Curated annotation (Swiss-Prot):
A biological process from GO: termination of RNA polymerase II transcription, poly(A)-coupled
Record keywords: ATP-binding, Magnesium, Manganese, Metal-binding, mRNA processing, Nucleotide-binding, Nucleus, Phosphoprotein, RNA-binding, Transferase
Gene Ontology molecular function: ATP binding; magnesium ion binding; poly(A) RNA polymerase activity; RNA binding
Other comments on record: Present with 17100 molecules/cell in log phase SD medium.
EC number of this enzyme: 2.7.7.19
Classification via InterPro entries: NT_sf, NuclTrfase_I-like_C, PolA_pol_cen_dom, PolA_pol_NTPase, PolA_pol_RNA-bd_dom, PolyA_polymerase
Species for this entry: Saccharomyces cerevisiae (strain ATCC 204508 / S288c) (Baker's yeast)
Cofactor: Mg(2+); Mn(2+)
Name of the protein described by the UniProt record: Poly(A) polymerase
Binding site for Mg(2+) 1: D100, D102
Subunit record text: Component of the cleavage and polyadenylation factor (CPF) complex, which is composed of PTI1, SYC1, SSU72, GLC7, MPE1, REF2, PFS2, PTA1, YSH1/BRR5, SWD2, CFT2/YDH1, YTH1, CFT1/YHH1, FIP1 and PAP1. Interacts with FIR1 and RRP6.
Subcellular location: Nucleus
Length: 568
């Protein structure tokens, strides 16, 4: 009788090992991942290790300096310690070239979050290796985003209720969570969840290859972005881990096929759980739909294994759920064809068709005439609220789906005058008018250090898109999207009084037809949609929203949304 360990909350579906044919397909999967650039070089890996070593030294120096300021002796200050942990894709071992490193700085109880954003921030700025830095202290999990020796790093901080943080510390003990506030709990949870996932899969190497493939697939198919209502990296990792538990002896190629089959047929909102949900020592909320109405509202719940268990997919909306399920069905069809030798793995990873899929798009552009750091904060806020706009749009009568794209489009221009800034806002975002921007200097990675550009005033732009599919039986019907769009603009403006300065921060929402999308959303080898010549000019049938005096003064533009959208 087999004594194989059982992983997960149920027994396996199958314990059969891989066949010769399946191993061959697995080899071809790995080759395709290499071809797609999923693996980094040994030198790139060594660079990451060196950067993390420097950050560990900085973490200890940070704790030491804060300790000395609080009148500790030199010996006590050194013993106070400080340690960094990684989490996310790097910790899981599935990072690729250019991936960021999610990094947690753990500090003792006398070091505060304010110290992190002052003392540690200053230590980072002293380093010659620092390329970029953007502190976001007001984020859900307060964060400092940096680029260090060319590597993007997201730094968060957690304070433990103990006087020392030695290098030997691990985070597995639930008692470490005592007496922490919610932000510290959330910060610690990333590393704790990542470590548990690795402990809960039968064969970590099989899991890693399968997860690399799913990450690549999800990015190519534009279903990878927690902020926009799709699963993020941790959620995709847990979904892959659950399939590995059900097929403990399968190779990665088989895991992929079963991944799409099982999840396309899953009885949502039945949760995906890697182990029984645990109680613990804290009076904190643990995911429980029997108690909490909010938990019952989760459409595709994927539950973190580390205490306190949370839903990693609470951001999924009705529209993004539809998109994800469509992609699961496509995955079933293609992987079945791969196993029948009718298609190759490259077919699975083909780019999405988002900008060809819909006739109508809502274009959301955040503008900043100021510093890059100002724009990162403003555009980051706008991005974080797009999901709320999606939820308001998808419940309108006549809208079948409001599908957010997962990647903002970033650009910046030299902008010497206010007239230039107004021109950018007026002409950007439409194929018909975007050539007017050629009169301004576009800032690129290649020219940004030139003296004439480096010191020039700049306008920064971040543009997001929502594809709209309408369900209108009466062709004379129109859909009014003005109210949710206006509420969205007002919400973004309300978060900080600085965002009321319309000479610096602006926000434009425009209703754009597929053939009028700007060139930047298409690859060079893609043929952009064209306007059908036989169709009547529908623009004349649009009832344009007239800007109120306050809107005109503010500089916000919601004209392009049109209050009554003609969807014919």
């Amino acid at each position: 009788m087999s004594s194989q360990k059982v992983f997960g909350i149920t027994g396996p579906v199958s314990t059969v090992g891989a066949t010769a044919a399946e191993n061959k397909l697995n080899d071809s999967l790995i080759q395709e991942l290499k071809k797609e650039g999923s693996f980094e070089t040994e030198q790139e890996t060594a660079n990451r290790v060196q950067v993390l070593k420097i950050l560990q030294e900085l973490a200890q120096r940070f704790v030491y300096e804060v300790s000395k300021k609080k009148n500790m002796s030199d010996g006590m200050a050194r013993d106070a310690g400080g340690k960094i942990f990684t989490y996310g894709s790097y910790r899981l071992g599935v990072h690729g070239p250019g991936s960021d490193i999610d990094t947690l700085v753990v500090v003792p109880k006398h070091v505060t979050r304010e110290d992190f954003f002052t003392v540690f921030d200053s230590l980072l700025r002293e380093r010659k290796e620092l390329d970029e830095i953007a502190p976001v202290p007001d984020a859900f999990v307060p964060i400092i985003k940096i680029k260090f020796s060319g590597i993007s790093i997201d730094l968060i901080c957690a304070r433990l209720d103990q006087p020392q943080v030695p290098l030997s510390l691990t985070l597995s003990d639930k008692n470490l969570l005592r007496n922490l506030d919610e932000k510290d709990l959330r910060a610690l949870n990333g590393t704790r969840v990542t470590d548990e996932i690795l402990e809960l899969v039968p064969k970590p190497n099989v899991f890693r290859i399968a997860l690399r493939a799913i990450k690549l697939w999800a990015q190519r198919r534009a279903v990878y972005a927690n902020i926009f209502g799709f699963p993020g990296g941790v959620a995709w990792a847990m979904l892959v881990a659950r399939i590995c538990q059900l097929y403990p002896n399968a190779c990665s190629a088989v895991i992929l096929n079963r991944f799409f089959i099982i999840l396309s047929e899953w009885n949502w909102p039945q949760p995906v759980i890697l182990k029984p949900i645990e109680d613990g020592p804290l009076q904190v909320r643990v995911w429980n739909p029997k108690i909490y109405a909010q938990d019952r509202s989760h459409r595709m719940p994927v539950i973190t294994p580390a205490y306190p268990s949370m839903c990693a997919t609470h951001n999924i909306t009705e529209s993004t759920k539809k998109v994800i399920l469509q992609e699961f069905v496509r995955g079933v069809q293609i992987t079945n064809d791969i196993f029948s030798n009718k298609k190759s793995w490259a077919n699975l990873f083909e780019k999405n068709d988002f900008f060809f899929r819909y006739k109508f798009y809502l274009e959301i552009t955040a503008y900043t005439r100021g510093s890059d750091e100002q724009h990162l904060k403003w555009s980051g806020l706008v991005e974080s609220k797009v999901r709320l706009l999606v939820m308001k749009l998808e419940v309108l009568a006549g809208i079948k789906i409001a599908h957010p794209f997962t990647k903002p489009f970033e650009s910046s221009y030299c902008c010497p005058t206010e007239d230039d800034y107004e021109m950018i806002q007026d002409k950007y975002g439409s194929h018909k008018t975007e050539t007017a921007l050629n009169a301004l200097k576009l800032v690129t990675d290649e020219n940004k250090e030139e003296e004439s550009i480096k010191d020039a005033p700049k306008a920064y732009l971040s543009t997001m898109y929502i594809g709209l599919d309408f369900n209108i039986e009466n062709k004379k019907e129109k859909v009014d999207i003005h109210i949710p769009c206006t509420e969205f603009v007002n919400l973004c403006r309300s978060f900080n009084e600085d965002y009321g300065d319309h000479k610096v921060f602006n926000l434009a929402l425009r209703f754009v037809k597929g053939y009028d999308l700007p060139d930047e959303v298409f690859d060079e080898n893609e043929k952009r949609p064209s306007k059908k010549s036989k169709r009547k000019n529908l623009d004349a049938r649009h009832e344009t929203v007239k800007r109120s005096k306050s809107d005109a003064a503010s500089g916000d533009n919601i004209n392009g949304t049109t209050a009554a959208v003609d969807v014919n």
